[in-house]
Amino acid sequence: MTRYVFITGGVVSSLGKGIASASLGALLQARGYSVRLRKLDPYLNVDPGTMSPYQHGEVFVTDDGAETDLDLGHYERFTGVHATKSDNATTGRIYSEVIARERRGDYLGATVQVIPHITDAIKQAILRETAGLDFVLVEIGGTVGDIESLPFLEAIRQLGNELGPHDAMFVHLTLVPYIPSAGELKTKPTQHSVKELLNVGIQPHMLICRCDRPIPEGERRKIALFCNVRPEAVVPALDVGTIYEVPISYHEAGLDREVLRHFGLPHDAEPDLGRWRRIVETVRNPEGEVTIAVVGKYTNLLDSYKSLGEALTHGGIANRVRVRLDWVDSEIFEQPGAVARLDGVHGILVPGGFGERGTGGKIEAVRFARERHVPFLGICFGMQMAVIEAARNLAGLPGASSTEFGPCEVPVVGLLTEWARGNEIERRAAEGDLGGTMRLGAYAATLVEGSLVRAVYGDAATIEERHRHRYEVNIHYRERLESAGLRFSGLSPDGLLPEIVEYPDHPWFIGVQYHPELKSKPFDPHPLFAGFIEAAVKQMRLV
């Protein structure tokens, strides 16, 4: 029997519904239950793939090629359960599906309305592919009271009634702010937020209250009284030093016990939180510190690189060091001598991105890492910049560039619209809906024997990683570039697409066409990030 937990948020945005959902999933897993997490986003975009990183933050790509909300990254990192395209639905996608059905005549001439047609489609999205699971946790994006959220709230209200209280639970995340002038925590915002939920017919069974200090017992009982929940169901969510401490903090506050009590399940035994305690201990008590310069385009909003920042932290956990990130706008390196800012860093990372702006600075950062023997990791666009730098400065091809920036004399990076996926040829068209010409999702790569990257992957001959890009390194320049010293150490199974490059005579220099950060977890750091930080530790001891 599958049980559903619906997580909503109120008062203000950015309270951490994604972390709360992921933490509850981790706690239920620690008690032996199977879980799946889903996110419903109330915006009209079909998916976040075409949204500006400054508007939305990172686009998290799943194995099956879905471009999804960054919260799905939290779900995967906390639970280890790989998300799919079924785990993220937007208003745009729901409306597109309903309109397509109406055009096909599926509704038999009925007047198509928000209720029941849109709400039914939302319920179908929630219930899809859940057989055999113990728990499905569904996060509703946005803030209660927003007009955009109303169809989703109505859908989960209906679903709560249809499933019944033994199979459905409503959890509401709110803010209990501290007012310095009054010297006390204020419960009124939470009361009003719950009132908004009641206006749409939802009575929450539990409140998670974000606060920066403990909630006095009297205030906790006051919240319970006015919001019509048990005092034990008012769960304080205190600020902690690292997000990986949240599952422990929530358990100590009674979150998982109260959820199990609601469903009539055993809740007295202690969950196994050993791996979370070990992670927190390592983060709190590192044996050293390394500085990594992240030379990117969207550094003004760090959510644009959410998975990347977490993956670097995971690399630090694997090596028992703190990773200090120096976020650098690549455009500054287009000024003469500015690249000297990288003196003293222990590693340089150039992440993914799109467009020509800032590419000159990224190429300068690549050159600095190559010439100074500083550990380097280039991801997606970062690998392409490494190839262009090698072509211009080592292979005698000063006109080398990418066709992404316009026509060029030496297109060492270009657009491909078809490639092999398994035994089939996959084609993308610019007018298509799913990313257009984007190469999305998990693809295999073969690693060259004796290469650094093969050693990093534990001598694996074949790997599978997630991609999100339109442009590819041109295989026709392989011989020229390898003669100049840049080794093509990973290729697509058909040998036509360069996936990994490295310098054999460099202490640690790897560029990858895929996004390894999307598969890294705190309890299972990705080998590339563990290896990169290990190389940075060695660099730290040299300088």
Curated annotation (Swiss-Prot):
Keywords, comma-separated and alphabetical: ATP-binding, Glutamine amidotransferase, Ligase, Magnesium, Metal-binding, Nucleotide-binding, Pyrimidine biosynthesis
Activity regulation information from UniProt: Allosterically activated by GTP, when glutamine is the substrate; GTP has no effect on the reaction when ammonia is the substrate. The allosteric effector GTP functions by stabilizing the protein conformation that binds the tetrahedral intermediate(s) formed during glutamine hydrolysis. Inhibited by the product CTP, via allosteric rather than competitive inhibition.
Start and end residues of each stretch annotated as Amidoligase domain: 1-265
Cited Pfam families: CTP_synth_N, GATase
Domain Glutamine amidotransferase type-1: 291-542
Active site: C380 (nucleophile), H515, E517
Reactions listed under catalytic activity: UTP + L-glutamine + ATP + H2O = CTP + L-glutamate + ADP + phosphate + 2 H(+); L-glutamine + H2O = L-glutamate + NH4(+); UTP + NH4(+) + ATP = CTP + ADP + phosphate + 2 H(+)
PANTHER family: CTP SYNTHASE, CTP SYNTHASE-RELATED
Protein name per Swiss-Prot or TrEMBL: CTP synthase
Species of origin: Acidiphilium cryptum (strain JF-5)
